[in-house]
């Protein structure tokens, strides 16, 4: 958090007032802030009343044993009932829940399905019955490793219906990453598909599941497989004693399923994220508070109306796909688009035009990609249905904000730049579209009912015009309850820096207006295309290669992905110079160990790494090199000449095309 960065941010003077029509009919008005401040618990109790409960709560919040929160104590609820059944019961069974758009199968023709709420209720009930027949009981964990097809939402809701916490693993992660997550949460059933489509080509998923399951001993009892691509699973690709086709057991199951109401604090899902230790961190979210937080913020931040068509482009393997594709929108009975593919030129704008999307929620990485392609592409489509735009995953720079507003939003759509985390479960900082004037690059203000602050090293509020650490002072409904199986690590990771404060790991600044600017991670977790990856985990993957002795990884600024992985490696003496293909070899190795998203953009083979006398690697100096800056203060290094050696190698560094 340099002084230069902080001072630059305060110069943004452009403002965009809420459209008058939107402001007049906004779901949430200015008075919500004062109402929430006067009685936070009453505010969230009112938000919880938007849901259907089996039994009402005796106590809104139990914070008697911090940092372990309990929300809506004594209440019972079922997430699937709130996302599906209650909308059918209210007479909205014919309303489309999902406009699903698959990858184009051939030029100009896409695989599409419309799933109504009545359809979804039947599918979820059938899947719940099928899982019960496979021995899944309340409390059992189920791993899900699937492409972006309707069945992944069905699988999640079927698990929620049964009270079986799901752990969804991003389909781009490796077999090793999947195995570690299956093992950590002790999942006995894995739901997957034969494959998915990416950029028009079939991509296999089942082989990675087979490899992962083989690493977990006899832990996994069944693998339930959706036929998506119809591709040949190959010799040994089907275990008749373990593997079950979805269409064999789900399609034939009964559509009648009596749901059980679960305790408000019953585990809903475990979401794994790369933590600073390099080992997967299982974030536990429970049911009542999480549903309250996600459904309310989806309704408030996106100003959702009955006739809106909403589209969140996130993959369901990430938390945004949980909170703002599955539980938030479906909890609110929204109609939404779900897309299997990647953002090819013009494809997204075609979908917005075809389905008359009115609310669009995507990441700055995608926006910057479209900027590079040129405005003539979106200009060729009718985007007049859009009325609100959202941004998620990382701070959006002012230039991208303006382009997004002008080119995609036609200079009429408010932008909600949202800040939240896997851990927070729900959006915590965002403009309210009918209340807040938008300021390019700023996430603006904490939402009603949340207590955000920016503090210095002594946990004192820094005040307007200053930067510091982003913290949360009071509990919120969708907050993580703990780390799966490790309460102590939960306390150490999030609550140990300052007593009573949740430290988000992000730096932030309050500008002269008191608006919040996010400055990115202050620890060693990188933000690549809106996805959090641990430098430690990537370093571990590099060092596991037989030619590598030591590695250091930094996140360097990248105009497209926000940050890019840059690695510095010392080879083993036996490896010599590693050979001409060493860089590509190491990239492929990281992709195999973790996933393609973690593949370094740049790898530099160096003779030594900059270390302090205590042996700590000075990553900030490596970041200077990766970002082509003048190297900073080297006085604390054990050998300051090391940086001259590394700088000497800079011209020979190999970067990804």
Predicted segments with their positions:
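Structural core segment of the AMP-binding/adenylate-forming
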Residues: 157, 161-248, 363-364
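Conserved AMP-binding/adenylation subdomain of ANL enzymes
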Residues: 291-309, 317-358, 373-376
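Conserved ATP/PPi-binding loop(s) of AMP-dependent carboxylate-activating enzymes
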Residues: 445-449, 460-494, 533, 630-631
